[in-house]
Swiss-Prot record:
<dbReference type="GO" id="GO:0030488">
    <property type="term" value="P:tRNA methylation"/>
</dbReference>
<keyword id="KW-0489">Methyltransferase</keyword>
<dbReference type="GO" id="GO:0002098">
    <property type="term" value="P:tRNA wobble uridine modification"/>
</dbReference>
<dbReference type="InterPro" id="IPR020595">
    <property type="entry name" value="MnmG-rel_CS"/>
</dbReference>
<keyword id="KW-0285">Flavoprotein</keyword>
<feature type="binding site">
    <location>
        <begin position="10"/>
        <end position="15"/>
    </location>
    <ligand>
        <name>FAD</name>
    </ligand>
</feature>
<dbReference type="GO" id="GO:0047151">
    <property type="term" value="F:tRNA (uracil(54)-C5)-methyltransferase activity, 5,10-methylenetetrahydrofolate-dependent"/>
</dbReference>
<keyword id="KW-0819">tRNA processing</keyword>
<keyword id="KW-0521">NADP</keyword>
<dbReference type="GO" id="GO:0005829">
    <property type="term" value="C:cytosol"/>
</dbReference>
<dbReference type="InterPro" id="IPR036188">
    <property type="entry name" value="FAD/NAD-bd_sf"/>
</dbReference>
<dbReference type="InterPro" id="IPR004417">
    <property type="entry name" value="TrmFO"/>
</dbReference>
<dbReference type="InterPro" id="IPR002218">
    <property type="entry name" value="MnmG-rel"/>
</dbReference>
<keyword id="KW-0520">NAD</keyword>
<dbReference type="Pfam" id="PF01134">
    <property type="entry name" value="GIDA"/>
</dbReference>
<dbReference type="GO" id="GO:0050660">
    <property type="term" value="F:flavin adenine dinucleotide binding"/>
</dbReference>
<keyword id="KW-0963">Cytoplasm</keyword>
Length: 434
């Protein structure tokens, strides 16, 4: 057994998973958790992996990418998924848990491991030596300042302002056209043209749609210079036509005329399978959000892989800063995990902790860190956060649009998803003993 100790900062979903993966590989872990010495605005207990929002870990079937990532994690002996399975409550095709039992179970498994030492204190400086930073979206101000200094001000963010993302295959290409404004540069946007009547219907639905209530600690977000589309709309219908939906320079090649309004879609991934809706960061609830977006011509049947969100979230610009091993590019023994890396969601956070933990253990044992291939769900997430366009980087959930394309195109969605899942699980089995 190596005598080197790995510091893990934060005992949330990612930190707990990372600590467990390091410890089970025979490496000593010093797990720092500032609760209960110092609480966050969202936590209520001193337990590890406390779920601060929903008690659902989302879909549990292999027809959904988050179901595939769970199954990969089961095969890799994830402590988070094991605890979730043991504390599950009825939820149809989803994996939901008794949140108190779940947190208690994770705490028990991690705390009682002989290679884990828990230290209840706030870390305000990044330690020397092998370290995994997994402090989550509510990282304390002092450590945030240190991370900002480490990564550079331009690469450290305090909130999400993410527009919705749709699958290209679900866009009605007969209703949209490829064009850049005034034909500058290459045609880079798919444009959804609207008549005045279509815009009016969209506008009325948008201003009437239900929004997510803001938590107290999130209320400063909108003063940071990034306005939700529904707030812009509430200032008057022309605000959108002169803002994110302005049609000037975007004549419709089918008619030769300028539409009344245009919604632009921008490619979001290297493979060209995902498109984001430009300027549509929003605080709408997901149900109403889908109804409003499907009023946009060409998006009537859009498959939304990530809904627009705006919430408090401390995260780094991973494409500029991290390798797909979750290592910091400027310091081999420093790893990041969890929502801080730009993965979005409980399961995705734990999955990043699993891989960061494995690689931290391998590093101190003198072994090569592992990069999971993007045909796997975990590998596709690591690839997305480290290889996507750094300029427009925003956090992302697991979805099949991030997976490496299938060798053979499959038209039916259910069969295509099944093929993604089968290939992912066949591949991950080669890594279960790393």
């Amino acid at each position: 057994m190596t005598t080197q100790v790995v510091n893990v900062i934060g005992a949330g979903l990612a930190g707990s998973e990372a600590a467990y993966q390091i410890a089970k590989r025979g490496v000593q872990v010093r797990l720092y958790e500032m609760r209960p010495v110092r609480q966050t605005p969202a936590h209520h207990t001193d337990k590890f992996a406390e779920l601060v929002c929903s008690n659902s870990l989302r879909a549990n079937t292999l027809t959904n990418a988050v179901g595939v990532i769970k199954e990969e994690m089961r095969l890799m002996d994830s402590v988070i998924i094991r605890a979730a399975d043991e504390c599950s409550v009825p939820a149809g095709g989803a994996l939901a848990v008794d949140r108190h039992e779940f947190a208690a179970k994770v705490t028990e498994y991690v705390k009682n491991h002989p290679n884990v030492t828990v230290v209840n204190e706030e870390i305000t400086e990044i330690p020397e030596g092998p370290t995994v930073i997994a402090t989550g979206p509510l990282t304390s101000p002092d450590l945030s300042a240190q991370l900002k200094e480490l990564t550079g001000e331009d690469y450290f963010y305090f909130y999400d302002a993410a527009a919705p993302i749709v699958e290209k295959d679900s866009i009605d290409m007969n209703k949209v056209y490829l064009k850049s404004r005034y034909d500058k540069g290459e045609a880079a946007y798919l444009n959804c043209p609207m008549t005045e009547e279509e815009f009016d219907r969209f506008y009325e639905a948008l201003i009437a749609a239900e929004t997510v209530p803001l938590k107290e600690f999130e209320k400063e977000i909108f003063f940071e210079g990034c306005m939700p589309v529904e707030v812009m709309a509430s200032r008057g219908r022309q605000t959108l036509v002169f803002g994110p939906m302005k049609p000037v320079g975007l004549e419709d090649p089918k008619t030769g005329k300028t539409p009344y309004a245009v919604v632009q879609l921008r490619q979001d991934d290297a493979a060209g399978t995902l498109y984001n809706i430009v300027g549509f960061q929003t605080h709408l609830k997901w149900g109403p959000q889908k109804e409003v977006l499907q009023l946009i011509p060409g998006l009537e049947n859009a498959e939304i892989v990530r809904y627009g969100v705006m919430h408090r979230n401390t995260f780094i610009n991973s494409p500029n800063l991290l390798r797909p091993t979750y290592q910091y590019k400027q310091r081999d023994d420093l790893f990041f995990a969890g929502q801080m890396t730009g993965v979005e969601g409980y399961v995705e956070s734990a999955a990043s902790g699993l891989l960061a933990g494995i690689n931290a253990a391998r590093l101190v044992k003198g072994e090569e860190p592992v990069v999971l291939p993007p045909v796997t769900a975990m590998g596709s997430m690591a690839n997305y956060i480290t290889a996507t366009n750094a300029k427009n980087f925003q956090p992302m959930n697991a979805n099949f649009g991030l997976f490496a394309p299938l060798e053979k195109k499959i038209k039916k969605k259910a069969e295509r998803n099944e093929a993604y899942a089968t290939r992912a699980l066949e591949t991950i089995r080669n890594f279960v003993n790393i």
